[in-house]
Design a protein with these regions (language model features):
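Conserved C-terminal structural/oligomerization subdomain of aldehyde/semialdehyde dehydrogenase
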Residues: 103-182
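ALDH superfamily catalytic-core signature
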Residues: 1-120, 145-147
């Protein structure tokens, strides 16, 4: 086996992407083995003009958008005191993580999603979570989304994984993504 260390797998959903397929793909990946695979998505950054549709699609497919109180409760359990992923959440179902945080969600909840704004290391949702917990960011445009993804990769460990959901005819944007994700 070849290991490359921690990863923080940011995803960008460009305005040109197929939203239904993109959201389905993230859910499929994030729920396989309850997100324990290091290449599973840790955050989704949606461009502002599709953000509401992306958010609604996640909800429609059984994901739970954390309210402010729940968001803070989950923030408290994502990381261990040492600043690494909390082993108590790794590979646990979303409902168990919610219970650990102190609230209830339906047992069939697929992912706990925190709508956050900061990609700084001070934000627990900006870290690798190895569980069905996902950060959701809104970027005003594609360039901003790339900058956010660059920061997440930089803080999470170069040389791992990033994803882009985009129309295949957007060659320049795809090339820019490939050049900037290290």
């Amino acid at each position: 086996a070849l290991g490359v260390g921690p990863g923080n797998t940011p995803v960008i959903m460009d305005s040109s992407c197929d939203i239904q397929k993109s959201v389905y793909s993230v859910i499929h990946s994030k729920t396989f083995d309850n997100g324990m695979i290091c290449a599973s998505e840790q955050s989704v950054t949606a461009i502002a003009d599709i953000y509401d549709e992306v958010r609604a699609e996640f909800i429609k497919r059984g994901c739970h958008m954390l309210n402010k109180k729940e968001l803070d409760m989950v923030r408290e359990i994502i990381l261990s005191p040492a600043g690494t992923v909390n082993p108590k959440i790794v590979g646990q179902p979303a409902a168990e993580i919610a219970k650990l945080a102190g609230f209830e969600v339906p047992a069939d909840t697929k992912i706990l999603i925190g709508e956050v704004t900061s990609v700084d290391v001070s934000e627990p949702f900006a870290h690798e979570k190895l569980s069905p917990v996902l950060a959701l960011y809104k970027a005003k445009d594609y360039e901003t989304a790339l900058q956010m993804a660059e920061q997440l990769v930089s803080d999470g460990g170069y040389g791992h994984t990033s994803s882009l959901y985009i129309n295949v005819n957007e060659k320049e944007k795809m090339a820019e993504h490939a050049a900037r994700m290290k």
